[in-house]
């Protein structure tokens, strides 16, 4: 009854999303990685852009990392893009990605090889597919389960934030879902609840229920097809769930960059190295070991600034010195999950660019060809209006 009620609700109320209109493992994989840290509405544009440029695993694997990062620009959590690229290079010839909408139903459910429709073909069984998916960089249990379910209709649960919320309320579970114990517990619940006859449809339905009805705040319990079985609703604890582990304190970090500009409108950029934030993204010349939090900027006056992107979690304040012969300064604040960045971009007009190691001379008109962090993109947006 629970399965049927949920699936019937889904069939009447689900949104039309491009990754639901395909069973191509590659496209479903791309969508799942994008949606790991991005809302559906925000991720839609990026998905279309990414798939348009990299329509299959071969086009992605043969691209440079710089180009992949460029097409990921704005999504954040850039390790996702780097892992996508690595995985594409590792898996480009894997049998799994040779399956498409025309032969997707030929996946073997037993450990023995099967014969494709009209063809002799060594096919993969469900365990081989799940194992292959989990071996890919950036793919864990949830993402592997989601791809196996949505692309191959295999009986694996798909757990995202929406599903954790539905399960925590359905079972009135007070275990923090983002702990090691919680992940194991909720995976067990999801496996027990899964409709093994219709895993693709069931996983889509429970995720959609969390997105449209079982909301983080003001959930629409009266419209929920699972309200008869919901223990949190019966115990009046819906608003208290799900439980998260305490989040680490966000620390302040101060950054300063110099934007050199010649009369020919050229500048210097360099690519970030190491394992810090924005690995392999480009940026202007960073002034190291600078802490300007106590600087006196009373001599700076506000300048007209571009509107922040809709939905941005950044605040921004553009400033410029009174005397036009002096450098300009752009002050920006950008919030990451674990850091609050206070950045200042000092614009210096120079007759020629300084000789700085590991930098690249580029035209300001060509900055669109390089991948930058969202913070640096705001500074570039200001430059475009000068």
Could you tell me what each predicted segment is?
Residues 4-5, 9-220, 226-235, 239-240, ...:
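Catalytic cores of DNA base-excision repair glycosylases
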Residues 1-15, 21, 211-386:
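Intrinsically disordered, low-complexity, charged terminal extensions of DNA damage-control enzymes
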